[in-house]
Amino acid sequence: MAQSSTNKVSYFESVNKVLYEGKGSKNPLAFKYYNPEEIVGDKTMKEQLRFSIAYWHTFTADGTDPFGAATMQRAWDKYDGMDLAKARVEAAFQLFEKLNVPFFAFHDRDIAPEGSTLRETNKNLDVIVTMIKDYMKTSNVKLLWNTANMFTNPRFVHGAATSCNADVFAYAAAQVKKGLETAKELGAENYVFWGGREGYDTLLNTNLKLELDNLARFMQMSVDYAKEIGYTGQFLIEPKPKEPTTHQYDTDAATTISFLRQYGLENHFKLNLEANHATLAGHTFEHELRVARVQGFLGSVDANQGNPLLGWDTDEFPTNLYSTTLAMYEILQNGGLGSGGLNFDAKVRRASFEEEDLVYAHIAGMDAFARGLKVAHKLLEDRVFENIIDERYHSFRDGIGLEIVEGRANFHTLEQYALQNSIIKNQSGKQERLKAILNQYILEV
């Protein structure tokens, strides 16, 4: 049985508290670039980056894949049922402390097992939520967001809010109702809706309009219930184009924003954008961030990376400095993420089965984003790309371009202008020069 909070089991005993030692350090259990108290711009790194550990990949994953059995035997796995759930809480808060992360995130079924009935399941959840709340009282860690797992249990074979079965819709509503109560209880700064199985495999058996309408009804019910109980955290939707269904309804940032506007939900939701999901959608991560940012929907980030050579969600820890730099470039221009953060929705590789690998992985991701933050800040401070972009679009600052921007032009006036100016001269986009500059900043800042 898991020990009480007064007689804790020690986990990660080979790991001391991870400290910043600088880029010259050879210590694999130290930060090289992430210095939480270092000021970048007008805030500390800790304030700018708002790192979060994902409960599911870190404390429940066992390395199972479609081709093989579990490879990861964690110290807490000797327990089962509710004892296992309690042991995971102990392990989680010890790792939070050792990595000095300010936030964590979870699905409801990550922290507590399902019972034979919804009532029993909720009772299990209440026990663990109370335990987590007690641990939070003596910890600096906060809940970035929680969400509902409405994709693992076979009842969700056809989806949850988009299921063809009204009984499933009702069950999903009850589950999210409990999730919102949990969010309020633990002070979650956000609540996430991930599509899970909200999509379809073939139109031959799908009433697409009804499913989308029902999804919107479900979201509105969530908004209404949050207001009813006084939960004021930010609602977030996490886009994904495919997997597990062939066509997920929240395909990408643009699709999801369109859905929110179509159903009048745009004032209640922002987006939680994942790098690997951008890859699956055929976009760069910075594209998704930019689309959300310029429309006012950038809320939070699931920090990971995908493998462009593979067609599935690999959820690797983020180590690509180009990606972290360009991501932070967007986030800084957004004025930060507000109540959102950088949640490591990432898992160690199946062959990285030792507990220390969990620490190495988070250090790598935190260092990569710390480096990206500093480079992005310097790029913005020097107006490297802004000056070039301003010059590239200079034709819209006066003359016919200004008339277009101000809405004073029409097809008649534009035709007359074109007839009088038949010689058009374009300028180079200078992509290669810009990439060389980006390289220089990444290498030198």
From Swiss-Prot:
Amino-acid positions noted as binding Mg(2+) 2 in the UniProt annotation, renumbered to this chain:
E274, H277, D313, D315
UniProt remark on cofactor binding: Binds 2 magnesium ions per subunit.
**Subunit structure of this entry?**
Homotetramer.
Reaction equations catalysed: alpha-D-xylose = alpha-D-xylulofuranose
Its family remark reads:
Belongs to the xylose isomerase family.
Q: Which organism is it from?
A: Bacillus cereus (strain ATCC 10987 / NRS 248)
> Which Gene Ontology molecular function entries are recorded, alphabetically?
magnesium ion binding; xylose isomerase activity
> From what superkingdom does this record's organism come?
Bacteria
Q: What is its EC number?
A: 5.3.1.5
**Compartments it resides in:** Cytoplasm
Q: Does the keyword Oxidoreductase apply?
A: no
- Gene Ontology biological process: D-xylose metabolic process
Taxonomic lineage per UniProt?
A: Bacteria, Bacillati, Bacillota, Bacilli, Bacillales
Give GO cellular component annotations, separated by semicolons.
cytoplasm
Q: NCBIfam families in the record, alphabetically?
A: PRK05474.1, xylose_isom_A
Q: Which InterPro entries match?
A: Xyl_isomerase-like_sf, Xylose_isom_bac, Xylose_isomerase
Q: What class of enzyme is it?
A: isomerase
Q: Which residues bind Mg(2+) 1?
A: E238, E274, D302, D345
What PANTHER family does the record point to? PTHR48408, XYLOSE ISOMERASE
- What keywords is this UniProt entry annotated with? Carbohydrate metabolism, Cytoplasm, Isomerase, Magnesium, Metal-binding, Xylose metabolism
Q: Could you identify this protein by its name?
A: Xylose isomerase
Q: Which prosthetic group or cofactor does it need?
A: Mg(2+)
- Primary localization: cytoplasm
Which catalytic residues are annotated? H107, D110
